């Protein structure tokens, strides 16, 4: 029998049309909003979990206010009663009911669909044996239903699903899970879940949480967000243990104060140290963002003096206009061992100082201006570092005729020191530069000359070799050239392009005695391959070395047919034509260490990187780093590194590191890292983590042991203590905040370095 098709128009069948539309219109938003917040999943989970099937297609051709009914049999009695039977489909513009039978009664203002009933819209799929819709009180009831939130991968059952225009949505005898059907590793069972109209939170009553059919905990009353908007409430706790803190439990409480700012208050209980309070306040506007962190631990139980311990930090970045920016980083802590003992989300336990700055910056095509206050919080018994209070920098550049460029770099700084007996200084510097840069596809050339004039006013210099007033003027000239030669070649059977790129630089800087100038912001740089052509041996301006030198270097690349670098080798060295007279830069040889760099993409899975500096005077390696990586995917990699420094502050450094991430079974991942001090024959850090990640839950177990750098009462640093810890994290996706399974990979790979610099 050919199915009958009936299209109902408001003019012809107004009451029947009205009976169907309120049902759709009133439940669409509450159900959609509920599923969005409760079922939010990570990107990883959405990739691995099967999504509920939804075959509904929006009927775009139906205008608003019109429904379409298709059935095998249709009976209409006196415009008061309509009955449909056999493969009944009731469709409006964006929803559909399919049933064996359906009745529309004008007298009772009810629509009843029975027999294998299914309701679908783009977000929701419901199956039952009966749907009752009453348009008089705007109420829909679906008994013994199975529901699926199709776009957000959640599902459950309800003894009764009720949608009421005034009371909202109510599910009685309801279960909820984001696990695949038949594989409900976790499940929430509640007497009721209600969502009131125009409210952003729902309420579950008498809720039991089951894992593998075992009840884990019970909540008589649970309020949860039903929109994607931020909501005030408890976040997932963090549990861990370490030799420094003992057992530690953190319970964050989130405060949604305003769309543009929020706060998190986190009590942290540590069995060894007591109760700590951590607070975080964030704000974000169209042009500004910032964060305030305050941590306070009263009467540290593990301290011999039961001292109060604290940490604070304020950061801000903002745009005052299109050209003006401001940045702030202000911080402090109670003692040198705070980070070592209590940890930090912002600093490393090996840090020797905290950097503070307040900056105002102006940027344009020709002029850049920067005004900064720079200070340091020194940890331990280290020499007090000079702070710039303030430092003004101005850079101006303009094009001249015939390809020439003219730029001026200038600075004005006031240097102070927390140590009241150290010298202080005001420094002014200006350096005009005239250059001729030429560049094309086969090479480049640069001719540059500059004059560097610096003036100092130094104070508190009694008992030193410094002079009160110093004026220093130096001239500098540079010639730099590079060529690029190419040829077609074969590389392991593939057609490639090989380049040969020789480069040379001559640099001359005049000499002036600088022994009467203090060191305020100057430290020595080491020369890797790129540093050979830098022309600058020190940071800052307090020491500018005299130079009469030639730098030679060469680079060769292998480029495949897809224009990707497969191999790059660089060699370079500085040849000193005269000895340096500036004491801090004096050389014992007529040439620098030979610097080499190697990057090699070995096939599609192996990557290698190496840097080495070899002294031509002793034929010994001064510095080296070697890295080899095997990578199949983002979470499937193995990397081994070795770092060597012959003389770093009087000590030789030789360290071996191993970093790995590998899936060991379906949904199971392992990450680890290990660093060993070869000279001292000891492991300085070990980290291992095991993670199970499915679409609906995740388990992460991490163990770590690392060398700590504690300071004694005299500020002297000890590197013989270790801190061990273990942490366990259990996440049930869909009942609160979730983070991707990559978090453990990110933490485990902290310190991982990209092993190559190929383009």
UniProtKB/Swiss-Prot annotation:
Entry similarity comment: Belongs to the LptD family.
Keyword Transferase: no
Membrane recorded as keyword: yes
Name of the gene this protein is made from: lptD
Name assigned to this protein: LPS-assembly protein LptD
Signal peptide from the UniProt entry: 1-45
Gene Ontology process terms (BP): Gram-negative-bacterium-type cell outer membrane assembly; lipopolysaccharide transport
Keywords: Cell outer membrane, Membrane, Signal
Record-level GO cellular component terms: cell outer membrane; transporter complex
Main subcellular location: membrane
Cystine residue pairs: none
Sections of the chain in a coiled coil: none
């Amino acid at each position: 029998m050919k199915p009958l098709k009936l299209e109902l128009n408001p003019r012809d069948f107004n009451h029947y049309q009205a009976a169907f539309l309120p049902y759709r219109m009133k439940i669409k938003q509450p159900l959609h909003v509920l599923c969005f917040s409760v079922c939010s999943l990570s990107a990883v989970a959405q990739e691995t979990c099967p999504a509920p099937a939804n075959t509904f297609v929006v009927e775009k051709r139906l205008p608003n206010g019109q429904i379409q009914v298709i059935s095998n049999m249709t009976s209409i009695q006196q415009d008061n009663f309509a009955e449909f039977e056999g493969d009944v489909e009731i469709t409006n513009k964006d929803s559909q009911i399919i049933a064996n039978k359906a009745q529309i009664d004008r007298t009772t203002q009810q629509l009843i669909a029975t027999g294998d009933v299914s309701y679908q819209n783009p977000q929701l799929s419901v199956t039952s044996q009966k749907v009752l819709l009453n348009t008089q009180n705007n109420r829909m009831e679906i008994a013994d239903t199975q529901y699926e939130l199709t776009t957000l991968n959640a599902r459950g059952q309800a003894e009764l699903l009720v949608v009421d225009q005034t009371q909202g949505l109510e599910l009685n005898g309801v279960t909820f899970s984001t696990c695949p059907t038949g594989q409900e590793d976790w499940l929430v069972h509640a007497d009721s879940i209600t969502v009131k109209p125009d409210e952003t939170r729902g309420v579950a009553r008498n809720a039991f949480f089951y894992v593998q059919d075992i009840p884990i905990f019970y909540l008589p009353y649970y309020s949860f967000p039903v929109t994607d908007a931020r909501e005030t409430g408890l976040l997932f706790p963090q549990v861990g243990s370490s030799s420094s803190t003992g057992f530690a439990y953190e319970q964050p409480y989130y405060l949604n104060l305003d769309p543009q700012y929020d706060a998190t208050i986190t009590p942290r209980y540590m069995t060894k140290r007591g109760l700590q309070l951590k607070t975080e306040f964030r704000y974000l506007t169209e042009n500004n963002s910032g964060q305030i962190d305050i941590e306070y631990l009263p009467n540290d139980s593990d301290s011999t003096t039961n001292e109060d311990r604290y940490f604070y930090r304020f950061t801000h970045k903002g745009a005052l206009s299109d050209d003006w920016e401001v940045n702030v980083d202000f911080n402090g802590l109670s003692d040198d061992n705070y980070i070592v003992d209590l940890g930090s989300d912002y600093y490393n336990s090996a840090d020797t100082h905290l950097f503070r700055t307040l900056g105002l910056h102006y940027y344009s095509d020709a002029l850049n201006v920067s005004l900064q206050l720079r200070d340091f919080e020194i940890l331990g018994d280290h020499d007090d570092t000079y702070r710039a209070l303030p430092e003004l920098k101005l850079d101006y550049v303009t094009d001249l005729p015939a390809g020439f460029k003219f730029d001026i770099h200038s600075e004005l700084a006031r240097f102070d020191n927390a140590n009241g007996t150290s010298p202080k200084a005001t420094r002014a510097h200006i350096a005009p530069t005239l250059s001729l840069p030429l560049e094309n596809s086969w090479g480049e050339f640069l001719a540059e000359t500059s004059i560097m004039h610096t003036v100092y006013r130094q104070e508190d210099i009694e008992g030193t070799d410094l002079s009160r007033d110093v004026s220093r003027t130096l001239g500098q000239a540079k010639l730099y050239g590079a060529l690029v030669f190419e040829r077609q070649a074969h590389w392991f059977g593939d057609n490639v392009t090989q380049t040969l790129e020789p480069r040379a630089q001559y640099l001359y800087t005049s000499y002036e005695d600088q022994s009467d100038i203090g060191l305020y912001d100057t430290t020595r740089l080491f020369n890797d391959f790129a540093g050979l052509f830098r022309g600058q041996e020190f940071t800052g301006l307090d020491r500018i070395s005299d130079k009469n030198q030639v730098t030679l270097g060469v680079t060769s690349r292998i480029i495949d047919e897809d224009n990707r670098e497969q191999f790059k080798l660089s060699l370079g060295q500085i040849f000193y034509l005269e000895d340096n007279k500036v004491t801090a830069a004096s050389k014992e040889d007529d040439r620098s260490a030979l610097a080499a760099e190697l990057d090699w993409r070995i096939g599609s899975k192996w990557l290698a990187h190496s840097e080495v500096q070899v002294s031509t005077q002793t034929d010994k390696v001064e510095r080296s780093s070697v890295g080899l990586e095997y990578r199949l995917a983002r979470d499937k990699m193995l990397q081994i590194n070795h770092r060597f420094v012959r003389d770093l502050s009087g000590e030789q450094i030789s360290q071996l590191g191993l970093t790995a991430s590998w899936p060991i079974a379906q949904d199971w991942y392992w990450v680890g890292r290990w660093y060993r001090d070869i000279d001292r024959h000891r492991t300085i850090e070990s980290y291992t983590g095991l993670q199970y990640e499915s679409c609906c839950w995740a388990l992460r177990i991490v163990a770590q042991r690392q060398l700590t750098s504690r300071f004694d009462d005299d500020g002297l640093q000890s590197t013989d203590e270790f801190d061990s810890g273990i942490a366990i994290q259990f996440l049930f996706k869909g009942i609160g905040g979730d983070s991707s399974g990559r978090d453990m990979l990110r933490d485990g790979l902290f310190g991982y370095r990209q092993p190559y610099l190929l383009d």
